Amino acid sequence: MALEDYVAFQKLMGLNVVQVKGTYWCEVRPFFYRPLPMSQVIHQGSTSMPFGAKFCGAQYAVPPEAKANSFLNRLSFENNGDYSLDSLQRNWKRKVRLASKDLIIRPILTASEFKQAAHPAYLSFYERTRYKVRSERRDPAYFANWTDALYRIPNILVLGGFRDRHLGGVSLTFLKDRTLFYATFFCDDDSLKLHLPDLMLHAVRESAAASPDISEVFASMYKGGNGLDAFYVSRGAKIVRQPAHLELNPLAGLIIRNFFPRQYAQLLGQLADVPAPASNAEGPESDPTAPTAPPRPNHSSSSNPNDLDPADLPPRPRL
């Protein structure tokens, strides 16, 4: 996927993206920025940060020899071609086999099919999670326009999980350089109970294992051990650490360090204990570039940690 198409996809998924001197930056929290793609290595002083970063801050990966003050942690599945169902732990293998009895995975090739079949699954996902990003898609007309824009972006694979002819869930993946991004997943309540998240992830990893052009499957940024982290780690994802430089507005830094120490530790990339296996976690729709960052309002009303917005943090302080 070309960089411009990658940026277009991130904008479509709700990110505010700005370009400064040839570098794309995404606003992952109000006035806090990281480059696109997130793993892009930037030499200090080689580019300028967005103007809005002056009010909160920015963070970017740096070369190994540079002086780093933090880490960017991502969850990825190493793709060395040897993945198979038998490589999974017994419980996750059982879930995939159970799901495959009721569900099939196949591409959704046309926008017209997606518009008609995917909207009910999205509405069910929203009612369960209250995930606010691009929640305008609850409106059928908005969802249709969003779908048209999605299908205009080249090289995105849209997979559907079907029960008979009923679409229960959707994933979006794309290949950038040698990384396959498992970018988005949502499903309805019935498909969640039938373990579609496990079957979909298995299908994506199995397909990736057959391609010598894919070195890793990127799942998400590591967010400090929440339910989504547990879902991926328990199924074999590794935490990949990348040295980074963190710059914070002095006042914002003072507030975060003193009133939100846990979030500050996550900003620095300090690893919490590896999350315990989640017995039934959903891989909710998420932007892979939405990692742990300065605190923001919690928009999820669900008490189920498997249904939390993957970027939920305590309320953002008033600056």
Regions found by a protein language model. Give the residues of each.
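Conserved donor-binding loop and adjoining core beta-sheet/short helix segment
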Residues: 1-80, 162-190, 241-243, 248-250
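Well-ordered, non-membrane alpha-helical segments in soluble/globular domains
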Residues: 40-47, 140-145, 199-203
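Surface-exposed alpha-helical segments enriched in charged/polar residues
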Residues: 47-49, 97, 148, 202-209
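Acyltransferase donor/substrate-recognition loop-hinge adjacent to the catalytic core
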Residues: 67-135, 258-262, 266-283, 290, ...
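C-terminal catalytic domain of photolyase/cryptochrome flavoproteins
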Residues: 224-299, 304-319
